[in-house]
């Protein structure tokens, strides 16, 4: 490609800015000191250049996190955009292959930056991957944990994307996705938080259910 062709190549801007954050595994430091801003992107080419340049979730050490959040929202429960929110959570047990973990992350990431949640994009804050030795977690954070209607629509799209991506694997990428509010997660006294909403990979499609 000539220099002229490079400068005139389409940029394909995204609708909004997204910032990629990385939390390292240096447990002797505070959480804030472990969190690093990697890059803010707002075009398709920037997104793929960044994605191709860094390790996938399966390549991270245990206790590391990836966070991709929109419009300068910080990946913290305490900030105003997240304080009343919740998350659609996918728990990935150790039985899942590294390729399946990476497939879940990429599928949801592409859906977010590609604005595939329609009008409900305004209710989505970002995407988180927590890499842990006992099993990792991937979650989509939303602004209002009490807006069940919007959160369910987001969950349905999330399920549809993951079910479609599951066709490239020997079994579904997930068993269940659960919606939890952040406040309950912070105050939990056990490893399990009661879900406000849930969707199973074995459930009939929502369109079929609503017709009954």
From Swiss-Prot:
Disulfide-linked positions: 125-129
UniProt keyword RNA-binding, yes or no: yes
Any GO MF annotation of the entry: translation initiation factor activity
Observed phenotype of the null mutant: Defects can cause a delay in spermatogenesis, temperature-sensitive sterility and defective sperm.
GO biological process: embryo development ending in birth or egg hatching; oocyte maturation; regulation of translation; spermatid development; translational initiation
Keywords, in A-Z order: Cytoplasm, Developmental protein, Differentiation, Disulfide bond, Initiation factor, Protein biosynthesis, RNA-binding, Spermatogenesis, Translation regulation
Major site of localization recorded for this protein: cytoplasm
Localization of this protein: Cytoplasm
GO cellular component: cytoplasm; eukaryotic translation initiation factor 4F complex; P granule
Keyword Heme assigned: no
Function: Recognizes and binds the 7-methylguanosine-containing mRNA cap during an early step in the initiation of protein synthesis and facilitates ribosome binding by inducing the unwinding of the mRNAs secondary structures. All 5 eIF4E proteins bind monomethyl cap structures. Only ife-1, ife-2 and ife-5 bind trimethyl cap structures which result from trans-splicing. Translation of trimethyl cap structure mRNAs may be regulated by intracellular redox state; disulfide bonds change the width and depth of the cap-binding cavity determining selectivity to mRNA caps.
The family this protein is said to belong to: Belongs to the eukaryotic initiation factor 4E family.
Quaternary structure (record): EIF4F is a multi-subunit complex, the composition of which varies with external and internal environmental conditions. It is composed of at least EIF4A, EIF4E and EIF4G. EIF4E is also known to interact with other partners, including pgl-1. Interacts with ifet-1.
Entry protein name: Eukaryotic translation initiation factor 4E-1
The encoding gene: ife-1
């Amino acid at each position: 490609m000539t220099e002229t062709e490079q400068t005139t190549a389409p940029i394909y801007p995204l609708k909004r800015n997204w910032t990629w954050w990385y939390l390292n595994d240096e447990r002797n430091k505070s959480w804030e000191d472990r969190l690093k801003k990697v890059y803010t992107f707002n075009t398709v080419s920037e997104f793929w250049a960044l994605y191709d340049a860094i390790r996938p979730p399966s390549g991270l050490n245990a206790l590391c996190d990836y966070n991709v959040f929109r419009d300068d929202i910080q990946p913290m429960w305490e900030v105003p955009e997240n304080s009343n929110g919740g998350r659609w959570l996918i728990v990935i047990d150790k039985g899942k292959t590294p390729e399946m973990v990476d497939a879940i992350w990429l599928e949801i990431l592409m859906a977010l930056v590609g604005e595939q949640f329609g009008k409900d994009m305004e209710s989505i804050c970002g995407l988180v991957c927590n890499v842990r030795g006992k099993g990792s977690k991937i979650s989509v954070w939303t602004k209002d944990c009490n807006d069940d209607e919007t959160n369910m629509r987001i969950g349905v799209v999330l399920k549809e994307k993951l079910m479609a991506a599951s066709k490239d694997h020997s079994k579904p990428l997930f068993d269940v996705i659960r919606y939890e509010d952040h406040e309950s997660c912070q105050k939990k006294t056990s490893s399990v938080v009661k879900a406000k909403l849930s969707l199973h990979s074995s459930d009939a499609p929502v369109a079929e259910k609503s017709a009954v």
